[in-house]
Amino acid sequence: MGSLAFSVKSEGGVTILGIGGVIDTGVAPQFEIEMKKAVAGGGRFVGDCSQLEHITSAGIGVLIAMKNTIQAAGGTFVMSAVSDKIMKVFTMLNLDKLVRIYPTVGEAVKAV
């Protein structure tokens, strides 16, 4: 069973979504609820994946859905601090083609 660690903070008009733990089918519904609450007001968002240990297709589906929701509302969603292990999965699934990914949270905040 997965373990979700999720946080929300603001930095310079950008909302930073701390995405961590193990996001699998068991916790993907809770992850989706937390993401929907966080992005409800629209705006500029950075997904901080520095604490993300593992993510399955269910969690990736939530990320893609939230990116689409944010963009449809005129907002921006990028990701940052993705480990090499997770980046391999994102690359295999072409997520890196759908969402801009920055090496650090600071770089991502400046970019959005």
Predicted regions and their residues:
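Amphipathic alpha-helical interaction surfaces in cytosolic regulatory modules
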Residues: 25-98
